[in-house]
Amino acid sequence: MSRHWPLFDLRITTPRLQLQLPTEELCDQLIDTILEGVHDPDRMPFSVPWTRASREDLPFNTLSHLWQQLAGFKRDDWSLPLAVLVDGRAVGVQALSSKDFPITRQVDSGSWLGLRYQGHGYGTEMRAAVLYFAFAELEAQVATSRSFVDNPASIAVSRRNGYRDNGLDRVAREGAMAEALLFRLTRDDWQRHRTVEVRVDGFDRCRPLFGPLEPPRY
């Protein structure tokens, strides 16, 4: 399939992790990881409470979401749901997305990690991986992210990678108002805070899919 869709050959590698688009086998592993648990059931770290689905529905919902993201890839509106592998096993997803990237040169990120893989620094490392890809390969100028104020682990990941606070947002979460911290990372701040070695393979054939980059016009 990579002959026609080169993004399947993209690999982003750090000292402990490898990130790539999920194959059929990796989708199965991701579903197993989800069924083992992603967060404490008393908490909800996501604005869309997808983890509340029944065990019977979670596999289909997961596949449907991943396939929708892959099928909907366009150069002016894309999302890369990269499977995060530890010792060859898929333990979570690190997504990178953008709208009108050739013009805005801005990316956003989101992620989840299996509960038993949390607390080992993988969250910081997988974010560092996609930030390197965004700034070094795609030549992004700004990266954004957000975390609910009651999610200190996610907040810490952003701050360790050099993001600056960029305000608050109010959103509905499971029928109630919740506040989210907004974060912004410039190219200069990213370069100053880089601590993780990252290697990208297989991007040359992918580059045309992201379109010609235009200098920002204000």
UniProtKB/Swiss-Prot annotation:
Pfam families for the chain: Acetyltransf_3
UniProt-listed Enzyme Commission number(s): 2.8.1.-
Reactions this protein catalyses: L-lysyl-[protein] + acetyl-CoA = N(6)-acetyl-L-lysyl-[protein] + CoA + H(+); succinyl-CoA + L-lysyl-[protein] = N(6)-succinyl-L-lysyl-[protein] + CoA + H(+)
Signal peptide (residue range): none
Record-given protein name: Acetyl- and succinyl-CoA transferase Rv0802c
Residues that bind substrate: 94, 109-113, 119-124, 145-151, 160
Record-level Gene Ontology MF annotations: protein N-terminal-serine acetyltransferase activity; protein-lysine-acetyltransferase activity; protein-N-terminal-alanine acetyltransferase activity
GO terms classed as biological process: succinyl-CoA metabolic process
Function: Acetylates and succinylates nucleoid-associated, DNA-binding protein HupB.
The UniProt record lists the keyword Nucleotide-binding: no
GO cellular component, one term: cytoplasm
Any coiled-coil regions, as ranges: none
Domain N-acetyltransferase: 32-188
Main enzyme class: transferase
SUPFAM superfamilies named in the record: Acyl-CoA N-acyltransferases (Nat)
